[in-house]
Amino acid sequence: MTARTADGKPWTGRMRTAALRRGLVRPAEFSTWAGARRYHERHGRDRQVLEKLQASIPKDGIREPLLLGVRATDRLVFVFEGHHRAVIALELGVRSFPFRWFWDPDVQTVEHDPFPHHALGRDGQTWLRHQEARS
């Protein structure tokens, strides 16, 4: 599922991949990133996607931004789209990844406002690389 943007131009930022490892950004469908990796390894189509990303990310980077959800009730941040890319980014030691975001449960609209870095904790701004105004 791809959410649409409020004004046609989603806000895009970059986040340090270490935020995934530290549990500040969680996988939506799995309890851990290791669990996501194991699941994808066991399924042929998912395994093929991982293999393609292992080959393409070192030379091309992550071209498609991950879509992060921020739960409005408790500010939990999770990957909604991009689990395969996140798993490989962690595995390859990629320093940062592009992302877009939405307020959960409004998955239909990707935000055009800057990411609410406070959702990552008091030092949330330190997890963001640079913020791109609408791309």
What would you call each of these model-derived segments?
Residues 1-80, 84-103, 107-119, 131-134:
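Short, charged/polar connector segments at secondary-structure boundaries
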Residues 124-127:
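F-box-proximal linker/hinge
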